[in-house]
Curated annotation (Swiss-Prot):
This is Phosphatidate cytidylyltransferase. Its main location: membrane. Belongs to the CDS family. It holds the Pfam family CTP_transf_1. One of its GO terms (biological process) is CDP-diacylglycerol biosynthetic process. It is a multi-pass membrane protein. It comes from the Bacteria. Pathway: Phospholipid metabolism; CDP-diacylglycerol biosynthesis; CDP-diacylglycerol from sn-glycerol 3-phosphate: step 3/3. GO terms for cellular component: plasma membrane. Keywords: Cell membrane, Lipid biosynthesis, Lipid metabolism, Membrane, Nucleotidyltransferase, Phospholipid biosynthesis, Phospholipid metabolism, Transferase, Transmembrane, Transmembrane helix. PROSITE patterns: CDS (PS01315). It is found in: Cell membrane. The gene is cdsA. Its EC number is 2.7.7.41.
């Protein structure tokens, strides 16, 4: 018979294992995406097609019992994937896309770290019980700082004043990071609706492709509009 203390140890061990798996997955995926975005455009196309296919597959597995919800996925998933591929076709956008992914990765990572460190009030307990307001603030501000740090990399260049100015860059990055968290909650709504925790298990420590890339659902269109109108 496992005692309450024993159960707590098992939970902690599982959490540590997940963190290690997340780190290992990141060590593989992040460099792969950096290479694809900055130096190998065909690889980026392949990666995005694989991501889109994985997201659609997991969405189908989650929502096949509801035609209206299934159709929603056929709209909200192909659009951001297509926009990212479209933006990447122009060589001058490579640092914009690199910056975008750095923001998405940063807000997820630091929101998790901030939530575990500072704890506090839950952000949306019914949709995502682990998310906290402290995690949201930590993630958004950290993503803004990471974006500014990325802008100091040699050869970094975006042909847009607002993305080149450090103050505007910080503000824009925080806005994208905030929308990324809303995008996460948007997908969490459907996961709760269909009573699933993770959309899949293909990415160790992260769950499914949809779990890892849900932030692009709402943010890519905003990035595209910023690129056009700013």
């Amino acid at each position: 018979m496992i005692t309450q203390k024993g159960k707590e140890h098992l939970v902690k061990d599982k959490q540590k294992s997940n963190i290690y798996l997340r780190i290992l997955s990141g060590i593989v995926l992040v460099p792969l995406f950096v290479i694809a975005i900055l130096w190998c455009k065909p690889l980026f196309y392949i990666l995005m097609i694989l991501v889109g296919t994985g997201m659609l597959s997991e969405w189908y597995n989650m929502t096949y019992s509801s035609i209206p919800d299934l159709l929603i996925g056929l709209i909200i998933i192909p659009i951001p994937i297509s926009l990212l591929i479209f933006l990447s076709m122009e060589d001058t956008n490579r640092w914009l896309i690199m910056l975008y992914f750095c923001i998405m990765w940063s807000v997820d990572t630091f929101a998790m770290i901030g939530g575990k460190t500072f704890k506090g009030a839950k952000l949306a307990p019914k949709l995502s019980p682990k998310k906290t307001w402290s995690g949201l603030v930590t993630g958004v501000l950290s993503a803004g700082l990471v974006a500014v740090l990325v802008s100091f990399i040699p050869n970094f260049h975006i042909e847009n004043y607002y993305f080149s100015n450090k103050i505007y860059l910080f503000i824009i990055s925080c806005i994208l990071a905030l929308i990324a968290q809303l995008s996460d909650l948007f997908i969490s709504y459907f996961k709760r609706k269909f009573n699933i925790k993770d959309s899949g298990h293909i990415i160790p420590g992260h769950g499914g492709v949809l779990d890892r890339f849900d932030s692009i659902i709402l943010t890519t269109l905003i990035l595209f509009l910023m690129k056009i109108y700013l």
